[in-house]
C-alpha cells in the first residue's frame, strides 16, 4: 500500500503517536537448548518466562529473555521449531536484524566473547554507530549497538563473566528489509507514526518515542533484489517486532488510526496472558505488534522474584498440559 500524500504531513505532537518504546522482539529459532544457552549464557540475559506458543496446535516453547525483572524494552522472545521441523526462508519484506544496546567501548569485548563461543562476530558501523555483527546459532542476524544515548542499567548476571561495563541494556531496535522504500517510509511516518531521523544510502532510520529518554530505532534497509522472505511462524526467521503502547486506550486509538488508513487486516486485540496485542503487516509484509502489559505482568503466574523459573501455561491450555509437555523438545533449563 502506498499513501496518496507523501511523507511529512504528520506532525509530531498531533496526538496520534501512542508509542512509548519497544515492548519486545520475537523470532522463530531452531533448537531449544542452543537458543536458551545463547541468550542466557552467551549474551547474559535472564529467563523471564517459559511458556508455550498460544496459537495453533503444535507444542512449541515460547521463551522470554531480558532484564531480571522483565522490564519492557528488554524482552526478546523465541519459538524454537526444531522438533516440529517447520522452517522459514529469510528474505526481503521481513524483519532482518535483532539489535540490542551495549555500553560505549564494549564492542571489542563482545567480538572476543562471541568468537570465543564459536559465533563469527565482526565490528562494523551503520548510521555512525559502532556495532558488533553476528548471528544466532539458527542464522538470524543480531547486532549489539554502542548507543551513547542509552541511560538504562546494563543487565549483569552472576557467573556469566559480563560486567556493568559490557552488559546488554535492552532492545536498541530492529532492521527491516524492504523492496519498496517509499511505501515503507509512508507506513513508518504516517501509520505508526515515527519520526524519520536518517535517510541515506545506508537506509532509513526512525526514532521510537520513549518517555524515559532512551534512544531506540527502527532501521529500514532497501534491498529490492532480495527475494521475498516467509511470513509464517517458522524456524530461522524473525516473526514480529512489538512496540509498547503503555495501555489499552493508546493501543485501541492507534489501532483505529491504522485501520482508518486502509490497513483493514490489522488484527483484533489478542490476549497474550501477560500483555494484550494487535498485529499489523507493513506494506511489504514485515509484521509489527502493538502491545501493552497487563497490571500483573510477568507475576501473573509466578512469584515476582522467580519469574522464568518454571514452565507455565495460560488458563485456556490447562486441559492440554500433559499432552503439550509430552510433545515439547527436551532441554535443560
Question: Can you say where each PLM-predicted feature lies in the sequence?
Answer:
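Extended intrinsically disordered, low-complexity coil regions enriched in Ser, Thr, Gly, Ala
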Residues: 33-42, 47, 94, 150, ...
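Acidic, Ala/Val/Gly-enriched low-complexity intrinsically disordered segments
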Residues: 4-5, 10
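Short amphipathic beta-strand starts and helix->beta connectors
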Residues: 79-84, 157-160, 222-227
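An N-terminus-focused feature that recognizes amino-terminal "leader" regions
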Residues: 17-85, 92-99, 107-108, 112, ...
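Conserved active-site tyrosine of GNAT-family acetyltransferases
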Residues: 35-40, 63, 114, 139, ...
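Surface-exposed interaction/gating patches
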Residues: 165-255, 259-264, 282
